[in-house]
Design a protein with these regions (language model features):
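Single, function-defining residue in the core of a domain
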Residues: 2-185
Length: 185
C-alpha cells in the first residue's frame, strides 16, 4: 500500500524553474531512508525495476538498513568476496575476489543446477512453475562501492518469457522469497 510519494520533475522543468534537479535515484534513496527512520524496527524491502539497479543507490540503501530487490543485467560484473588479508601484506586491501562467470554464461551452462519453484499470483495469471538458480556474490565496478548481493536467475521451462536476473542486497534472503517480492510488487 503506497504511503509516501514524491514528484520527480524532469531536468528541463527544474532548469526552467531555476531549481536543482534531483534524479529518480536521489529521490528514491531519500524516500527509502526516510521510511527507514519512520519504521526503525521493521524489515524494509524496496522493490524496483532495473532503473534502481545502480551501485551507489544500492550501497546507500544497504548501509541505511534497507533491503533492495531489482532486476540485474545478465552481463553484470560479479565477483567472489575479497579473501582475508594476510598479515604483512603491503598495498591497498583487495575489494573483490575472483571474477565469476556472467549470468548469461550460467544460463547456458549445462552443469547449472536448477530448482523448480511454484510462484502464486504470477503477474495476475495464477500459479506459475519456474526454474531458478541462485548464489551470493559481490557486485563491483571500478571506482564504485562493492555491494554484496544474492542474485537469482529465473527461466521459464515453457518459454513464455525470456530469462531474467534479480538481485537482492540481503545475501542471506531466500531466493524464492526474492522472486515472490518482485511478483507481488
Amino acid at each position: 500500500m503506497p504511503f509516501l510519494t514524491a514528484l520527480v520533475p524532469s531536468e528541463r522543468a527544474c532548469r526552467e524553474r531555476g531549481r536543482r534537479h534531483k534524479t529518480l535515484l536521489d529521490v528514491g534513496r531519500q524516500m527509502a531512508l526516510q521510511a527507514r527512520r519512520w519504521l526503525p524496527g521493521r524489515d524494509l524491502v524496496l522493490v524496483g525495476d532495473s532503473a534502481f539497479s545502480a551501485l551507489l543507490f544500492l550501497d546507500a540503501l544497504r548501509r541505511g538498513g534497507v533491503t533492495a530487490i531489482t532486476r540485474l543485467r545478465l552481463d553484470a560484473a560479479l565477483y567472489d568476496p575479497a579473501p582475508p588479508r594476510l598479515p604483512g601484506t603491503i598495498g591497498r586491501p583487495r575489494k573483490t575476489g575472483a571474477r565469476r562467470p556472467t549470468l548469461s554464461k550460467i544460463l547456458t551452462e549445462p552443469a547449472t543446477i536448477w530448482q523448480q519453484v511454484s510462484v502464486p499470483g504470477w503477474y495476475g495469471t495464477g500459479e506459475r512453475r519456474i526454474e531458478i538458480t541462485s548464489a551470493s556474490a559481490v557486485w563491483h565496478h571500478s571506482g564504485l562501492p562493492v555491494v554484496p548481493v544474492r542474485w537469482v536467475l529465473i527461466r521459464d521451462p515453457e518459454n513464455h518469457f525470456q530469462p531474467l536476473a534479480l538481485l537482492c542486497t540481503d545475501p542471506a534472503r531466500d531466493p524464492t522469497q526474492i522472486v515472490t517480492c518482485l511478483i507481488l510488487s
